Amino acid sequence: MEEPEDNPYIRDPPLDFEPVDELDAASATRQVETLREAIRFHDYRYYQLADPVISDRAYDQLFERLERLESKFDRSSATSPTQRVGGEPLDELETVEHVAPMRSIESSVEVDDIRDFDTRIQERLAAAGYEGPVRYLCEPKFDGLSVELVYEEGELSRAATRGDGQEGDDVTANVRTIRSVPLTLDGDCPSFLAVRGEIFMPKDAFQEYNRERLERGEEPFSNPRNAAAGTLRQLDPSVTAERPLDCFVFDILDDGGRGFETRMAEHEAVESWGFQVDDHTARVDDIEAAIAFREEMLDGRASLDYEIDGIVIKLDRKDACALLGATARAPRWAYAYKFPARTEETTVRDIVLQVGRTGRLTPVALLDPVEVSGVEVSRATLHNPQQIAELGVGIGDRVTLKRAGDVIPYIEAVVDSEREAHFEFPDRCPVCESPLERDGPLAYCTGGVACPAQLRRAVEHYASRSGLDIEGLGESAVDQLVDAGLVERLPDLYDLSVADVAELDGWGRTSAENLLEELEASTEPPLPAFLSALGIPGVGTTTAADIAREFGTLDAVMDATAEELRAVDGIGPTLGGEIAEFFDSDRNQQVIEQLRKRGVDPEPAETAGDALSGQTFVFTGSLDGLTREEAHELVETSGGTATGSVSGNTDYLVVGDSPGQRKREAANEHGVETLSQSDFESLLESHGIEI
């Protein structure tokens, strides 16, 4: 996408807009069109090139200005960037017919089948009198959901899932929310165009989104493909808009009569019109080069931020493809050379229940140990009773265990039922016998901290790095303290004596003294750490920091109303109510009061909040003693901005061990100052920011 000319909102945009009420309709219309053009360009730079040219704050102001103008002067449009936030919920997804059949592709993991495919092509083309070159286009086989995107006069008019290949679900409203799918096309595009793409959720985004779901007390998705599938078929587009979907376009279904000679020419045209394409796509001279391409992609698979399960080999020349045609099921000119499956079979030996710190019961399958993708697996989470029923899994069953990408292994299906026992979900907690409470598919123990399992998990969380980071108070130590009756409530930690701890198995006086010193050091924690340590459902380290910045002291947080909490950035109406409910609980108030009586006094939120205001940081490489997330939090809680890519708006590139070459080259290109970790820490200290 070329940079628009004479558009004032591209680089260093003026943000001191004149009041909307002072604009006439003609001026407002011109500004709306200029803003739309600029925002589309900024979306392209950010989402497809990962190289923004303005700050996030400037982008937000341009976006908000466009929203106000469209609302004030009734200039809304289905192709406006503002429409990506999602429309009204649907009653159901309609079924629509595809412009062209979306056929399956023959596939195999055997190299002999790939060579046979090439032989068939050579023989059929020779029989048809074809004398042109036989070259192949190779591309990754994405593990997502195929969609058909239809554009009329350069504007997205429809999006549909693959369905049965002839018709699929109309998911236009949801696809409009995906930033990498252009609502309007660039350049000399056909007046009518239908393309095929793959919707997916990037691996890093999947892990982060699952972490957020867990913090909110929601069920995590089992793998990126399921996350993308469930998101794309949402009836409420606003839900889709909140989830990090992405899209690659890889095929033209109808080019409006353009008649491209090769698939590589199609690939280049698609990119020029503004679609995101995968940059690994390559044209090769023969089938052996295609086989080598597959091996390269297999070797580099782990480094990709999206799931692939093989490559697709396509005949490059379109006239040759036309000669070969297709069967009812698949084209004769394409073949998928898949990777070896990351699936293994094993036997379920038992199903047990784990009780978490919130009281939630999670069934876990105990398995005969099996290696999956180089990792020995002997346990797999079954999530809830509903999943057990859907899988139909029981003790003694032979099951397939799958590890998609880098996610936690999960049971995919029952292969052979040799059931020794049927698993019945109980009505009472297996640990403390308290009644269970159901919330949809989830079950919770009502015993609270009187339940030893909940107490153990609560203490572990309190002492974890996400809490107060109390060294020496890990899972085994907590188990010993609870089993010995030394800790029956969270505040009991601060009643421990050296003599009591030293008598425990494996402990001595020195290790006991070290633990008590750690506990003493934890009595003046930063407020964000204390809030996170309490284990408030839905409140992780980031949300805790947001709350602390807003209210400043523990008393102010405890006194905050649900409405006041909902007003904090990043906290919606549901979470705001849950936080208020947590602090309204007599049980939780008593725990906090008992902690205070034992000397635990959280420090008010730091007042260095604006010390880094206006400064943008990018990090590359690993930092000693500091995760990337923690580094970002240090910057953002001090008023600065932390982004993932270097641009002209970046002030500092912080370079750790094994840094990325691309970011360093971009820093040189843009004249960005580079800092070592030591330089970065000195900069923070100079602003009074504690690390």
From Swiss-Prot:
Keywords: DNA damage, DNA repair, DNA replication, Ligase, Magnesium, Manganese, Metal-binding, NAD, Zinc
Enzyme class: ligase
GO biological process: DNA repair; DNA replication
Binding site for Zn(2+): 429, 432, 445, 451
Domain BRCT: 607-691
Reported cofactor(s): Mg(2+); Mn(2+)
UniProt cross-references to PROSITE patterns, sorted A to Z: BRCT, DNA_LIGASE_N1, DNA_LIGASE_N2
A Pfam cross-reference name: BRCT
Active site: residue positions: 141 (n6-amp-lysine intermediate)
Binding positions (NAD(+)): 56-60, 104-105, 139, 162, 198, 314, 338
EC numbers on record: 6.5.1.2
Annotated catalysed reactions: NAD(+) + (deoxyribonucleotide)n-3'-hydroxyl + 5'-phospho-(deoxyribonucleotide)m = (deoxyribonucleotide)n+m + AMP + beta-nicotinamide D-nucleotide
Molecular function terms, GO-annotated: DNA binding; DNA ligase (NAD+) activity; metal ion binding
Function: DNA ligase that catalyzes the formation of phosphodiester linkages between 5'-phosphoryl and 3'-hydroxyl groups in double-stranded DNA using NAD as a coenzyme and as the energy source for the reaction. It is essential for DNA replication and repair of damaged DNA.
Family: Belongs to the NAD-dependent DNA ligase family. LigA subfamily.
Alphabetical list of NCBIfam families matching this protein: dnlj (TIGR00575), PRK07956.1 (NF005932), PRK14351.1 (NF010931)
Name this polypeptide is given: DNA ligase
Organism for this UniProt entry: Natronomonas pharaonis (strain ATCC 35678 / DSM 2160 / CIP 103997 / JCM 8858 / NBRC 14720 / NCIMB 2260 / Gabara)
